[in-house]
Amino acid sequence: RWGDMLDHTIDRLLDAVWVLALALNPAFCGQASLGWTAAWFTLLGSYMGTQAQAVTGLRNYRGFSRADRMVLTLVSLVATAALIPFDAAIFGTVDVFGGVPITAMSLMVVVSMLGGVWTFLTRFRQAAGDVRRMDAKDPLPQPGASDE
């Protein structure tokens, strides 16, 4: 149990730190506000899968997963590396969060942020349905309720 808890804890932290580190890197994005926002939503999405497992006993892997983020990150890094020799790695700037350069890596951070929101909502909805079905089939005893 301790190993499982430790594994889940470290996994959740690394999910967020990975996105944050890429967003904070000035060569890729350099935007702390975007990075923290993306890390927060990534963490929420990852957390909801673990929370569903803790409550229902069923692990929920739906949504934008770590594997999806890794593939997207790899594609973004390859695209960035291919564009740098042509001085074309920055496509422009968006005036949000104080100005965000549009690069393959900043797009990866934004997609990870939106993926985190979508994953959280998807996993929450599924877990809520699972809990409702469990409660309908086998409700937990309520304190102070009579056993009639």
Model-identified regions with their sequence ranges:
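Membrane-interface alpha-helices at helix entry/exit sites of multi-pass transporters
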Residues: 2-7
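A feature for the membrane-embedded catalytic helix bundles of lipid/isoprenoid biosynthetic enzymes
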Residues: 8-148
